[in-house]
């Protein structure tokens, strides 16, 4: 993919809400990164303030934030219960772009989580989610995981292939207070812009609820 499809210097870019910019970049990634475009790195901290990162899949995004789901029994869920601050990093190498989001997480209403689970088309992923009630717990062998998956498949045969959303699946919405867009350039003069919510009058005025700053690459 050519990276000459627009510059962060464009005034049209700077006048947009950052979520609109993200939508534009995300749609481009869908075309050029068809298998990995929804993936991001979620970073949280534990009770000892030690960082932890893992790859997640974005479920949805809108003007209110970035949505993703997790096992409520997992370490990351425990991290977010104790510390609601988190960051997301999207990296699309074919597009030569990266987006880093920082903000506060909140749990999504139960009916929204169930709707997301019901509308998901990855049946094998659903089966695995149900089988792995206690995520990240030590196990003696993966044989037990496969046995549990087969038990669920047999259950589906007698229940119209339906899969209810497990109670331990939790949905999160990350409300951004800072979004950074990075466009890699061949001459290493990368373009990097940060949009954030605050009252710093020294920064440039962007969208009505955001201000922007250029950052060195």
Predicted regions and their residues:
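Binding-site signature for planar aromatic cofactors or substrates
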Residues: 1-217
